[in-house]
Amino acid sequence: MYWGGSLADNKSLRINGSIRVREVRLVDAVGQQCGVVPTPEALRMARDINLDLVEVAPQASPPVCKILDYGKYRFEMGKKLRDSKKRQRLQTLKEVRMQPKINDHDMAFKAKHIQRFLDEGDKVKVTIRFRGRELAHTDLGFNVLQNVLGRLVCGYSVEKQAAMEGRSMSMTLTPKSKK
């Protein structure tokens, strides 16, 4: 039976003596419904098998209570919460910068990094920075971006096409969703 600990972390659940209604709809330890039972009798049934009476649906009329091990129940709920937080990964924006006069090996290296970022589930912003008179040859930057796209393995989609932004040209790639 659950004896200690504060319920400050889980105020919505009432257990054992803190259930203050006259009668409850009872679900026993195996999951079978026992019907509407007076609260003192439900508490006695829970104590007889050395478990707790936990109010799982206080909004229902009458409230639904279940006979279970409260410590184990809290552990399972915490485990579910941790697992859901673990799976909930935020998508971040990574930026890879290049110049229009990029060497072939350097481009392959950058393309490999872009592919890794996409495989990890991140968005990637590919930026070509123009310096000085390179700004007159924006077509070279566009060719570099097309070359990078050609080197990538499928598994991405272009969110924002190549466009000039001041002295740089950028394009945003997103990973395709895994279904």
From Swiss-Prot:
InterPro entries: T_IF-3_C_sf, T_IF-3_N_sf, Translation_initiation_fac3_CS, Translation_initiation_fac_3, Translation_initiation_fac_3_C, Translation_initiation_fac_3_N. One of its GO terms (cellular component) is membrane. PROSITE patterns: IF3. GO terms for biological process: ribosome disassembly. It is found in: Cytoplasm. Signal peptide: none annotated. The keyword Disulfide bond does not apply. Keywords: Cytoplasm, Initiation factor, Protein biosynthesis. Gene3D superfamilies: Translation initiation factor 3 (IF-3), C-terminal domain (3.30.110.10), Translation initiation factor 3 (IF-3), N-terminal domain (3.10.20.80). One of its GO terms (molecular function) is translation initiation factor activity. Its main location: cytoplasm. SUPFAM superfamilies: Translation initiation factor IF3, C-terminal domain, Translation initiation factor IF3, N-terminal domain. It holds the Pfam family IF3_N. IF-3 binds to the 30S ribosomal subunit and shifts the equilibrium between 70S ribosomes and their 50S and 30S subunits in favor of the free subunits, thus enhancing the availability of 30S subunits on which protein synthesis initiation begins. Belongs to the IF-3 family. Monomer. This is Translation initiation factor IF-3.
